[in-house]
Amino acid sequence: MAVLGAPGVLCDNGATAERPTLDHHWDLWKKTRMRRNTDQNEEDVRRLIWEKNLKFIMLHNLEHSMGMHSYSVGMNHMGDMTPEEVIGYMGSLRIPRPWNRSGTLKSSSNQTLPDSVDWREKGCVTNVKYQGSCGSCWAFSAEGALEGQLKLKTGKLVSLSAQNLVDCSTEEKYGNKGCGGGFMTEAFQYIIDTSIDSEASYPYKAMDEKCLYDPKNRAATCSRYIELPFGDEEALKEAVATKGPVSVGIDDASHSSFFLYQSGVYDDPSCTENMNHGVLVVGYGTLDGKDYWLVKNSWGLHFGDQGYIRMARNNKNHCGIASYCSYPEI
């Protein structure tokens, strides 16, 4: 398997040349990920991107083995995509301007919070979803937060319809653009006004379609949403510990280190606070002495650690994870 670790060869023009020794691994990856490139030019482009990502993985993990990184990366179903393509297909967070607040969390400074929380252990988190090539991250983040509240309120864990939000919260009053992007609080406002169907009655299609909301299939509603103080990780910790899963926006969906993340605590110094992706914080803790947020993504089980990523906590609001946080109340 030494061949797999060989980095790509750089041509004079800076492009990465295909390595024939990787032919078998490329074919194996395509078969595993069910990739079929009918156009030879497309095949060649994808192969070069894949080799570039493979080289990044090998170099990063070599540095990780020397203690230079707190996380490892690995090849996954996005291995033949560029960072720009990943954010174009799967990001699309649209922060409202101005950012309106329907309520804010009042911190209890004297409250003792647990050292770690994982709402999955309490049955408040549904299975990991796959948004596909639709910028609906915001919808999955919002529905995930409400699913947790619904479980805490009724004792029932129900998958809610992200497609309902994609199709129906696009009116001017909400400002969401379906697969073109949106924001979690606007989704909450739609649910306050209308309610939301279940995933079973309104399944996900990964594309913009006509609104088919049916009140007969209503699975949940909420009375208001709460927004946390901007950039306050302590407030986020308190909300996650005492209220449930929290919707957040992050930057880094467009970084190779993020979409190829595999394990450990993600901490990339190049991460900014330029929001481009909506996710769900379902817990927090400490791993090997490094504090983290436990984050549920909507990129399927092949992303990260079975669909989850641990992101650095108490690290100057790393990736802006505490900048735009909210959760609904039933």
Curated annotation (Swiss-Prot):
UniProt KW Hydrolase keyword: yes
EC number: 3.4.22.27
Expressing tissues: Highest levels occur in the ileum followed by spleen, brain, thyroid, ovary and uterus. Low levels are found in the liver, kidney, jejunum and lung with lowest levels in the heart.
Active site positions, chain numbering: C137, H277, N297
Alphabetical list of Gene3D superfamilies matching this protein: Cysteine proteinases
Pro-peptide positions on chain: 18-112
Keyword Hydrolase: yes
Signal peptide range in chain numbering: 1-17
Biological processes, Gene Ontology terms: adaptive immune response; antigen processing and presentation of exogenous peptide antigen via MHC class II; antigen processing and presentation of peptide antigen; basement membrane disassembly; bone resorption; cellular response to thyroid hormone stimulus; collagen catabolic process; metanephros development
A GO cellular-component term linked to this record: extracellular region
GO MF term (any one): cysteine-type endopeptidase activity
Residue positions the entry lists as glycosylated: N100, N110
Key words of the record: Cytoplasmic vesicle, Disulfide bond, Glycoprotein, Hydrolase, Lysosome, Protease, Secreted, Signal, Thiol protease, Zymogen
Cysteine-cysteine disulfides: C124-C222, C134-C179, C168-C211, C271-C319
Main subcellular location: other
Cellular localisation: Lysosome; Secreted; Cytoplasmic vesicle, Phagosome
Induction field: By thyroid-stimulating hormone.
Pfam families linked to this entry: Inhibitor_I29 (PF08246), Peptidase_C1 (PF00112)
Enzyme class (EC, first level): hydrolase
Record-linked CDD domains: Peptidase_C1A
Domain of life: Eukaryota
Catalytic activity: Similar to cathepsin L, but with much less activity on Z-Phe-Arg-|-NHMec, and more activity on the Z-Val-Val-Arg-|-Xaa compound
Subunit structure: Monomer.
Family (UniProt): Belongs to the peptidase C1 family.
Function in brief: Thiol protease. Key protease responsible for the removal of the invariant chain from MHC class II molecules and MHC class II antigen presentation. The bond-specificity of this proteinase is in part similar to the specificities of cathepsin L.
Name listed for the protein in its UniProt record: Cathepsin S
Taxon lineage: Eukaryota, Metazoa, Chordata, Craniata, Vertebrata
Gene that produces this protein: Ctss
